[in-house]
Amino acid sequence: MTTVGLAVAAAAGAIGLGWWLTRHVRARWLPVLLTYFAYGASGVTAIALTFFQKDTLGLQPADVARIAFWLGLPWSMKMVVGVASDHYPLLGERRRPYLLLGAGLSIVGYALLASSVSTPSAYLAAMLLVTVGYMIQDVVADALSVELAADDRELKQIQALGRTFLLGGMIAAGGKLGGWLAGAFGSRPVFAMAIVLPAIVAVAGLFVRPQRTVQALPDSGPLAGHNAWIVMTAGLAYAAFGALLGLLAVARAQEIVLLVSAVLIGTLLWQVGVTRAVLVAAMVIFLFRATPSAGQGYTYWAIDGLGFDQDFLGWLAQVSAILSFVGLVVFRRTITERPVSFTLLWVTLAGAVLYLPNIGLFYGLHAWLGISARSLALIDATVSAPLAQLTMVPMLVLIARTAPRGAEATMFAIMASLMNLALSASELLTRYLNEHFAITQQDYSHLGQLMLVVLGASLLPLLALPVLQRAEADLERTHPPAGAVTDRRTGR
């Protein structure tokens, strides 16, 4: 698309969006909705980050997985930030200062990426600032979405609009636009442009009405009495512990942090009063989420070996973003009405089958079929993308059915931390595989073997399905389904 065409499309989109906003959105909701949009649109830097890691920093695939592990950990601390925002005001207010703090951290992180970052350690520090910033913004937006609603009807409206703005940001900025910007301007200018996103949140945050009343502590559950202080102290100690291990380059630091995280989350699950059946089901879903991937080694090879550039990778991301949303809409009802074990079975088997074209690309399947590598990659993305957003839905269904009365929000927060921890475990396993097969930018010869191992590993959790089915039978007796469940978020 030409520059003129992009300008015309942007102008038309802006006019249409403005008309729609005036009809459906109240002004006081905008800080929340713009926060969700900014988080969704933050994917605009994804392709720029890939080329920055590869070309500017010279990171090997195992190094990328090592960094991704640390970047996933802040999302397991959402509950701690939620407690802080609820019970420990900053500058006399409960929401606005935290929102501005989160936006400020992301702005500083992007500014460092755009200017001075030139080493892996500096890159990790800058990305942690960006990630922690978005995590804080996300927590505050979740809380504000409840506080701004005058009644249940308004709450449902805000939740639906939140999902719309989040997905709108992902689709609008996370694919073709991100690839085009990275190709046309380079990585650092894209990071500079991305500063606009948290800046929008900061400006919107100035219009949040002050919330000076400290929320009363609940009478039961993990936050009862003085337990909120314990959660805060433990969370801060955990963050300091992880940072210290990383800075001192302690051997097996990631494994130690993962183990400590699992113990902390397990303790919270025990305090909230989950049953054995729920715990078993959560552990099985954890196994499915923790399976390794090929990591950046495959993307690096596609760039070097197949000639995939920023623009084409942007197209793939755009197709995946749109069709993953379509898949969520089409399959959500089926998923929520069937047992979790059934959903995990068919999603896993389908995902394994649809992973085969990626392996085929490495071994020259496109040449054998007489089509270009880009055509096969685009076909594969089109077919497999609808499954991308489905793996978290079973956990949402499970939580909604089994959360102790009055502790639903706490249960969601703890389980979200557990699932984010599973993604960190996945990055750890990905690092192991890349190190074992010695995948580097100079040598991709063992990449095919790695991908075959990843395919096999994706099927291993199926062995735990009989255990999950027995747990589901217990849940059917103790927590009969009350209807379909929906959730307004599609990610962390």
Q: How would you describe each model-predicted region?
A:
Residues 342-394:
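C-terminal transmembrane helical hairpin of 12-TM major facilitator-type secondary transporters
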Residues 14-75, 246, 250-251, 279-306, ...:
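Helix-loop boundary and gating motifs at the non-cytosolic
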Residues 75-78, 156-175, 320, 416-427:
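Glycine-rich segments within core transmembrane alpha-helices of 12-TM secondary carriers
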Residues 77-93, 182, 326-346, 434, ...:
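Helix-to-loop junctions at the C-terminal end of transmembrane segments
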Residues 405-437:
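A late C-terminal transmembrane helix in Major Facilitator Superfamily
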Residues 2-25, 117, 137, 150-294, ...:
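Intracellular loop-helix junctions on the cytosolic face of multi-pass helical membrane proteins
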Residues 61-62, 146, 150-162, 310-311, ...:
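Loop-to-transmembrane helix entry/capping segments in MFS-fold secondary transporters
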Residues 83-87, 114-115, 170-192, 245-250, ...:
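Transmembrane alpha-helix termini and helix-breaking/packing motifs in multi-pass membrane transporters
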